[in-house]
């Protein structure tokens, strides 16, 4: 069953068409990729899925229901979480505190409970802390839990952003260039981590990534867009042998 489906999705900014008729499907517990050259519209697609942008036409279906028109926080509550190409951590907060912020969108205690039911609020905070520690253990970040986020290595910051996304209990995890800035060893570890996340948390993953070795090695299905338009969809082998993809994207690697 498809957990996410984009049906002929188009996004226009005035007279500019950034995304034009994209169709995409992600099955439950599947790892998929969306690829294309810089400016192809990949992040715009992510922004439409997460409610940062509203679609001009078409539909975004999550868990069998349209989420078009929903606000970003509503989409998080429904079970979609994302990371960003440019890391967006709370740099002066600790590693543990960063993950705990992800749980706060799911907590039930509001201002009334903070004032009149302080014990319940503190109990919920303690539960969030323990769950955050579990995520840090899972990602191998427990040893740096008390450090400020800005003081941990870049690769760890990437993992921390994934950890914060996991704290929202997603059914679909969107990763926007998760390997950007990582060295070859960190990229290998990232591949294993993404697979482990999928298997442990029983979620689907859709990633945008320029590292083709990583994409081809981890993705079960790949969608390719060029100048906002879809040009191919299939397995890694099918994409690698697709003439349109080679001409528009993969074939450029030798020149770059």
Where are these regions (language model features)?
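Glycine-rich phosphate-binding loops of nucleotide-dependent enzymes
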Residues: 1-256
């Amino acid at each position: 069953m498809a957990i996410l489906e984009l049906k002929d999705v188009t996004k226009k900014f005035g007279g500019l068409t950034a995304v034009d008729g994209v169709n995409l499907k992600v099955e439950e517990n599947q790892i998929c990729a969306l690829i294309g050259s810089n400016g192809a519209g990949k992040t715009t697609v992510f922004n439409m899925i997460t409610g940062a942008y509203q679609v001009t036409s078409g539909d975004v279906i999550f868990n069998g229901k349209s989420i078009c028109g929903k606000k970003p926080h509503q989409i998080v509550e429904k079970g979609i979480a994302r990371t960003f190409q440019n890391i967006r951590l709370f740099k002066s907060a600790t590693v543990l505190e960063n993950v705990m912020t992800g749980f706060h969108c799911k907590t039930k205690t509001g201002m009334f409970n903070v004032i009149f039911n302080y014990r319940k609020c503190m109990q919920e905070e303690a539960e969030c802390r323990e769950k955050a520690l579990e995520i840090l253990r899972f990602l191998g970040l427990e040893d740096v839990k008390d450090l400020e986020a800005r003081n941990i290595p870049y690769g760890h910051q990437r993992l921390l952003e994934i950890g914060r996304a996991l704290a929202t209990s997603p059914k679909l995890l969107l990763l926007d260039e998760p390997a950007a800035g990582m060295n070859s060893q960190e990229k290998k570890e990232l591949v294993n981590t993404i697979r482990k996340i999928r298997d442990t948390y029983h979620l689907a993953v859709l990633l945008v990534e320029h590292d083709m070795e990583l994409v081809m090695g981890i993705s079960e299905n790949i969608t390719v867009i060029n100048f906002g338009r879809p040009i191919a969809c299939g397995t890694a082998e099918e994409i690698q042998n697709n003439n349109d993809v080679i001409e528009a994207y993969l074939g450029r690697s030798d020149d770059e």
